[in-house]
From Swiss-Prot:
Pfam families: HSP20 (PF00011)
Taxonomic source organism: Streptomyces albus G
Protein name: 18 kDa heat shock protein
Domain of life: Bacteria
Family: Belongs to the small heat shock protein (HSP20) family.
Statement: the UniProt record of this protein carries the keyword Magnesium: no
Domain sHSP positions: 23-135
UniProt keyword terms in alphabetical order: Stress response
Gene that encodes the chain: hsp18
Length: 143
């Protein structure tokens, strides 16, 4: 049996999936940056227009999950949108954290639409010098 594929229909389907608002079962990814500042990793997520109360941050084992939801502005009953280009819905991002990070000391700040997480490196993973001692017996190696 010969199947025909309409590339325009397929393109429309992909466009709808990419531009559709996120849902809790299928959230949209949020942009992020990550860098290291000394002994701390800094991860920033763009979440403009999101109420800080609508942001959830969970760490389970080594999986960090950030979820946020942005709804329509104002009271939806009395608002008639003329232009709606800003994405609405649920946004989510998951990161696998290394065992060398201290997940008990994660700090989160939300300012000017940017969520910033600071994740310190665990003390046990920081660089340290090991002093070399001299043994009790001194033997000369001959060969």
């Amino acid at each position: 049996m010969l199947m025909r594929t309409d590339p325009f229909r397929e393109f429309d389907r992909i466009t709808r999936e990419l531009t559709a608002p996120g849902t809790w079962s299928r959230p949209t990814a949020m942009p992020m940056d990550a860098c290291r500042e000394g002994d701390t990793y800094v991860v920033s997520f763009d979440l403009p227009g999101v109420d800080p109360e609508a942001i959830e941050i969970d760490i389970e084992r080594n999986m960090l999950t950030v979820k946020a939801e942005r709804g329509p502005a104002g009271n939806a009953e009395h608002v008639r949108m003329e232009v709606a280009e800003r994405p609405l819905g649920v946004f989510s991002r998951q990161l696998v954290l290394a065992d060398t990070l201290d997940t008990e000391q994660v700090r989160a700040d939300y300012d000017a639409g940017v969520l910033t997480l600071r994740i310190p490196i665990a003390e046990r993973a920081k660089r340290r010098r090991v002093k070399v001692g001299q043994g009790e017996s001194h033997r000369q190696i001959t060969g």
